[in-house]
Amino acid sequence: MVTTKRYDYVPIDQVQEHPLIANHRELNESKVAHYQRDILKNGLLEPLVVWERKQREYFLVGGFHRLNAIKRIRAEHPGYYDRVDVRVVTGELEEIRALNL
């Protein structure tokens, strides 16, 4: 069963994509641009959802477009979003893969 383990504030470089749980759709450039503007204006209002496999090893489960927006913000504004809010979930790999966030 997938459960929320905790909410945390982690270094963005520790959030990675895992090939077996990449359940996102194709990257939508207009959606990423929208998130860039929104995050710069209002901050990250909804945390990324990550699966913690080992201590400080986080794999993205939900928030693919937001993560890409943050990466682009960081490229344009060094020092922004070195850390991000995340919801850390636990569960077996098959349960995590079944999520469609």
What are these regions (language model features)?
Residues 96-101:
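Short, Lys/Arg-enriched N-terminal segment that forms or immediately precedes the first helix
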Residues 32, 94-95:
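Alpha-helix initiation and N-capping motif
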Residues 66-67, 92-94:
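Short, charged/polar surface micro-motifs in flexible loops or helix N-caps
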Residues 1-87:
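Short, charged/polar connector segments at secondary-structure boundaries
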